[in-house]
Amino acid sequence: IGMPGDTIQFRNGNLFLNNNPIPKIKIKKKYKIRCGTSTPVVNAYQETLPNGKRYIAVYNKIGTMQNTDLYKVPSNHFFFLGDNRDCSKDSRYLSSVGYVSSENLVGNAKIIFFSNDSISGSVLKFWNWNQSLRIERSFNLLK
């Protein structure tokens, strides 16, 4: 979400890019998302970046990232943000993930090859895939 020189911040659960709020529209579909030891049903939103790119993000309002410091992306680095806004280990965790160096980018994602709902079953337990495989997400080309 963040390019070199960009600033990113969450204020009261709202995402700001370069001090501008990212518009989000609530969608009808709800998701059951694991966050720590709880699995709440959460609201989903369509967010739109300044370049017009749209994507779905979920907010469960139980994570610790409702309000963050201001992140300024260094040169030759990028800022990655998970779609589970309140419970993703992403660039906001500077000591463990942090900003991603451009030398660590090795290609472009083209397809979601495999998607598993870990709430319904472990990806390692292939005998449960009939319950946990998210076929509607698997094998989709990325835009």
Write out the residue ranges for each language-model feature.
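Soluble "head" domains of membrane/secretory-pathway proteins
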Residues: 1-143
